């Protein structure tokens, strides 16, 4: 952990009587029981049988070839190749650990990401998105955002995404280069009226619908 790294760097071995680092907690810790097992499965290239329960659907059972663990917004996700049976093609999926209801070892040969998805660099799978939702039929595009001056100072020092760049000839404007997805919408709506999406029009249209829906819930109440 980073605490162990700091202790090693500063040669510290001190029995603390009070906390000196505070981590943002997460009330939903059910997924923790699977973290270590999946981490070892990735290192050892071992398949798992995962019972996965989407919020609005029945349990699905996958043969999983685990490739990568990712944390986003206080949730853990597994990027893996999945099969419904040993005879079906491998499909890439991102599964939230807190929707896993059961997991077993399974004696199925592990198929590496390089073999299953030769055109995909798994380490870069999430590179062009915010969050974990990637849609192969959606293009990566520029997102132009105008910020209030005060919010611009905050966003310029705490980027929304690694692709974020300032626009030299447009004060208080930034540019992202990402794929549109639900997490992008969530992240931008977080800033409320402190920002305006200038481009693309598709996001402006989406936000207009969201805001109209919000207004209908609060209007005359």
Residue ranges and their predicted role:
Residues 39-86, 91-93:
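Loop-centered beta-sheet repeat module
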Residues 1-53:
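Bulky hydrophobic/aromatic content
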Residues 84-123:
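Flexible linker/loop signature enriched in Pro/Ser/Thr and Pro/Gly
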Residues 33, 59-65, 140, 171:
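Short beta-strand-initiation
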